[in-house]
Regions:
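Preferential activation on post-signal-peptide N-terminal prodomains/segments
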Residues: 2-17, 26, 38-309
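Hydrophobic H-region at the start of alpha-helical membrane spans
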Residues: 25-33
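Short, non-transmembrane alpha-helical segments in secretory-pathway proteins
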Residues: 96-108, 250-259, 303-341, 386-429
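Amphipathic, soluble alpha/beta structural segments
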Residues: 161-182, 347, 354, 402-438
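Exposed beta-strand-loop-beta-strand "reactive/processing" segments of non-cytosolic proteins
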Residues: 253-297, 328-378, 418-451
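Short helix-loop boundary/capping segments
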Residues: 366-396
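C-terminal structured interaction module
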Residues: 444-464
């Protein structure tokens, strides 16, 4: 074919297109309209396959079978009844604590008003009272979850408080002081608390009731010395049980359970060279096999960022997060809150007593309502299987006089908390068996480290 023929063909096609341009345009327009209708119909009738996504969601829901409410994870550390002559309480009694919690949930507060916390003892002189002590200071929004404050009809602006004292007036009306010794403030309110019912439980208990002594830490003020903190210790030496428990096996399935729950897209998670470090573009999961502990870090949030946007209590965020990310496992209870850093801590409780071991703590850090860090133990004790239970042994613990003598070796301004707790150790030669030994512990120093109160060779601040 010569170039002249090619030219003639192109010229003919061009002329044909020109002469039929309107027809071609109409046909093309009709085609596009038909294509648009077909695509629209396809979108409306599309039935995508979500089976893989639903499988993942179902798996996560199946893993979280032990969700909890705020009131499920908050429990008093002590309940003391003063009968005008002596102080009494019931340590290590789960049933008693549960009954008190139910009473508190049903208690209404009304006609609340702010007062200074000075001269509390004078105000309670010659009165019976019940003191409910919590393990840490709690803010008003947390108390509003424990108590019925909707009908308070007054102000409830106390910054934080760690105890509530219920007492009967001469009119038999039950009032309450919600007290913060450290803030030197309190709220007084009328209540519907069943004072006599709780008093009768303690008076009628056939066993487990101990007599206590108060121990005050004082500070100097312009008006003289005043109580900055108050502890209660059993007056006489007393006995508690030590226990041994099997733990569930920790294997790849255990790691996968947390990996699937913590990462948004587990399929895109990369593992490190050791296989114990997992990461995606925004977070990481570090598994420590020596301590059987995991640490999840969210790189998009840092603990040093501005906290002004923290609009919700870190405790509420923590409970929601654990509920939605592989659950609780053993019974953990709220034990410490630092609102300034957004840090929340939970301790494992066994038969009413906390396990004091850093490797067993559950800790979450929040910045502006976003999680920045989550640490917890992979160890889960088998606490409900009688077939594999071990016989408990009696252990004698020190009296109030001995505790007070030991505290003379400490700077009381650095003593944060005192508690009876379990020391948790491996049984000799049995990696899956843990021994729990009750002891007195002190939370000491600016780093808030727990250590045994009674030691043979080391002084305050020594290693745990």
């Amino acid at each position: 074919m010569t170039w002249s023929k090619i030219y003639n063909i192109i010229k003919f096609v061009a002329k044909s297109v020109y002469r039929n341009f309107e027809v071609i345009k109409s046909v093309l327009l009709i085609f596009l309209i038909m294509l648009s209708l077909i695509l629209t119909w396809s979108l409306w009738t599309l039935k995508p396959n979500y089976s893989n996504l639903e499988e993942t969601r179902t798996l996560k829901k199946a893993q979280v079978t032990d969700t909890k409410k705020i009131t499920d994870v908050i429990r008093p550390s002590q309940i003391i009844y003063y009968d005008k002559n002596s102080y009494r309480g019931m340590p290590a009694n789960d049933n008693f604590i549960e009954r008190v919690n139910q009473m508190l949930e049903n208690t209404k507060f009304y006609e609340s008003r702010n007062r200074p916390s000075t001269n509390i003892d004078e105000k309670l002189k010659n009165k019976e009272y019940i003191e409910v002590i919590y393990p840490t200071d709690m803010t008003a929004d947390i108390y509003s979850q424990i108590f019925n404050l909707t009908s308070s009809g007054g102000t409830f602006t106390i910054p934080s408080a760690d105890r509530v004292i219920f007492y009967k007036k001469d009119t038999n009306e039950v009032e309450a002081h919600i007290i913060s010794y450290t803030q030197r403030k309190m709220i007084t309110a009328s209540t519907t608390f069943p004072f006599d019912s709780l008093k009768n439980i303690i008076n009628n208990a056939k066993s487990g009731v101990l007599e206590y002594e108060p121990y005050d830490v004082e500070r100097d003020t312009d008006q003289g010395a005043e109580v900055s903190r108050r502890f209660y210790f059993p007056k006489q030496s007393f006995e508690l049980n030590s226990y041994s428990y099997l733990s569930r096996s920790i294997n790849s399935d255990t790691i996968d359970r947390y990996k699937n729950a913590l990462f948004r897209d587990p399929g895109n998670v990369k593992s490190g060279n050791t296989g114990e470090y997992y990461t995606d573009e925004s977070s990481a999961l570090d598994v420590n096999r020596n301590t059987n502990r995991i640490k999840y870090t969210n790189f998009t949030q840092g603990p040093d960022e501005d906290m002004t946007q923290q609009t919700r209590s870190p405790l509420f965020n923590s409970v929601d997060f654990i509920n939605n990310h592989a659950g609780w496992g053993n019974p953990y209870y709220f034990y410490n809150l630092d609102p300034t850093s957004g840090s929340v801590e939970f301790l494992l409780f066994v038969r009413g007593i906390p396990v004091i071991k850093s490797d067993m703590e559950m800790k979450l850090g929040w910045t502006n309502n976003e999680l920045n860090e989550y640490q917890r133990s992979l160890v889960e004790l088998v606490m409900d299987d009688k077939e594999y239970s071990f016989k408990p042994k009696k252990v004698k613990l020190q009296s109030a006089a001995e505790v007070k003598a030991a505290l003379k070796e400490y700077d009381m301004s650095l003593v944060n908390k005192l508690a009876v707790g379990y020391e948790m150790t491996h049984a000799r030669g049995q990696e899956n068996v843990y021994n729990l030994q009750p002891k007195w512990f002190v939370n000491y120093g600016p780093s808030h480290d727990w250590q045994p109160l009674f030691r043979d060779s080391q002084g305050p601040g020594g290693e745990f």
